[in-house]
């Protein structure tokens, strides 16, 4: 019994000694989070506005290779085989370079030009052709145009002009001012332009009050006048009698004065599409003009076919309010005997193309219409 007790005490002593000899395990310390850097407070400056001119414009194109002409502006191109021409178009230019005196044809379209400095044109007195389409020109200094006596063609389409430029050269033959913001025509601005053949003022802001009885005074040889896409309610007064082509589409014209076209012996082409014309606003024989060849009256409020000349070749009456058509009534030569199939076409009406679709008509084409207009090649209903 005593020996068993001694053995038990010895075993406990051995276990206690072994436990004291082992190292004590400590828990691993968790990594501390890195301190976040403190952001300095940003001062509250006002936000800048959207970029405005000229910062919103693309950069000008780099200069091209050296030219064979020492006076050629680096930002332009001077073709060796065409020494009188200067091409500065589509180069993101803000300013007009100095134009050499040898230049007759100047191309500056598709840029960001806002003005025409006098210094740029002081030597270019022989210019005949200037193309400034699609720029940002708001006004033309009359001192520039006064120094260009040989100018024949002036293109200023797609700019920001608010009035027709003054001091236009006397020898001008074509003046193109479409797609601007023009709402004013200075008095007498055309008075010295006897050589002008074409005047294009479409897509502007011209109203009836702009046109006075003397607005077109001086345009003795004008052949083409384009006033389409404006805000006219009346026919313009005192249009030059030499006119051949008259464009008045997309206005708000409601009526044509009696005998309005009688004073135009050379008028061959009329466009009055997209207006507000009705039978009440069309006096009898309004379009019965001896030299008229093409007449556009589509997209109006016309309910009957107007009287036409026997020389008319193309008639557009589509998209109106026409319900019926009587060939006997509209026949210029008042043909009654439809049994006459004579081959003599000397006095037969010249109408070759007739468009009537978009009305209230239904096929077939009336027989009396075909008997009158025997030269018809196409009828659209």
From Swiss-Prot:
Residues 25-39 have a biased composition (Basic residues). GO terms for molecular function: heparin binding. Residues 19-65 are annotated as: Disordered. The keyword Secreted applies. Glycans are attached at residues 123, 288, 319, 326. Residues 56-65 have a biased composition (Pro residues). Pfam families: LRR_4, LRR_8. It comes from the Eukaryota. Belongs to the small leucine-rich proteoglycan (SLRP) family. SLRP class II subfamily. The basic N-terminal Arg/Pro-rich region binds heparin and heparan sulfate. Binds collagens type I and type II through its leucine-rich repeat domain. This is Prolargin. The gene is PRELP.
